[in-house]
Amino acid sequence: MPHDHHHVLATYHKAGEKEVQMAIDAAMKAHKEWSELPWVERASVMLRVAELLSTKYRYILNASVMLGQSKNPFQAEIDAPCELIDFLRFSTFYASQVYADQPYSETGILNRMEYRALEGFVFSLTPFNFTSIASNLNMAPAMMGNVAVWKPSTTAIHSNYFLMKVFREAGLPDGVVNFIPGQG
């Protein structure tokens, strides 16, 4: 880990071409159902992640960030739980405003703005030093109905993998966010 390179915190399989293709295939398979899910149901997953991180998993996430990214308790708390929970809650709040904001309609005429997800997937190459941003680069697009292929930094894999487990526990369906650790 950054402060002690001889201490092994975890091991992981480095994804190759086959795993990357599997992640892309899984994302595209999940795309239609996830993008057509009502936004309030997608928002409920984000809010469950925020709730799990603010209660049950707060200290585990802090410890993972401290060990994996060599942050002190104060830095870990600000980076991971605090900022990440804010990102998740803000994203759902602002999504509600985006979906509610509609153009003016005259009597007998309906003007309506419809939002749709991207036709492909989001590729997120996340930073080594901010666990909260690693989550946000995946979950903000997911909030809006997109699917993602996530390549975490090799020095942040432990905390990022932990987040992926929390996403799953919160009800994020298979294929919506696809975690592929590897070189680069």
Report each predicted region and the residues it spans.
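Alpha-helix initiation/capping motif
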Residues: 1, 72-73, 127, 183
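Short conserved beta-strand segments at catalytic cores or DNA/RNA-binding microdomains
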Residues: 1-4, 142
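Glycine-rich loop-to-alpha-helix module at the N-terminal edge of alpha/beta enzyme cores
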Residues: 3-99
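Rossmann-like NAD(P) dinucleotide-binding subdomain of oxidoreductase/dehydrogenase enzymes
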Residues: 66, 93-184
